[in-house]
């Protein structure tokens, strides 16, 4: 059986942590930033964790 392919779009957006969780970046950070408060923009810089329900689906896209 041939090797499974990694979904390249998912590989650019998600990273696996050491404990097996999946990290993601937050949305709403690229433009229209003037109306967003500094506190909100600061919170958007921090990485988020993928929810349990979505984690299995994303893990299938990232086999390695």
Swiss-Prot record:
Keywords: Ribonucleoprotein, Ribosomal protein. PROSITE patterns: RIBOSOMAL_L35 (PS00936). GO terms for biological process: translation. GO terms for cellular component: cytosolic large ribosomal subunit. Residues 1-26, 33-44 have a biased composition (Basic residues). Residues 1-44 are annotated as: Disordered. Pfam families: Ribosomal_L35p. The keyword Ribonucleoprotein applies. The keyword Ribonucleoprotein applies. GO terms for molecular function: structural constituent of ribosome. Belongs to the bacterial ribosomal protein bL35 family. NCBIfam families: rpmI_bact. This is Large ribosomal subunit protein bL35. It comes from Alkaliphilus oremlandii (strain OhILAs) (Clostridium oremlandii (strain OhILAs)). The gene is rpmI.
């Amino acid at each position: 059986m041939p090797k499974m392919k990694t979904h390249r779009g998912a590989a650019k957006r998600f990273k696996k942590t050491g404990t097996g969780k999946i990290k993601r970046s937050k949305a709403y950070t690229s433009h229209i930033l003037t109306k967003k408060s500094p506190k909100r923009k600061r919170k958007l810089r921090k990485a988020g964790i993928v929810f349990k329900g979505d984690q299995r689906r994303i893990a299938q896209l990232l086999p390695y």
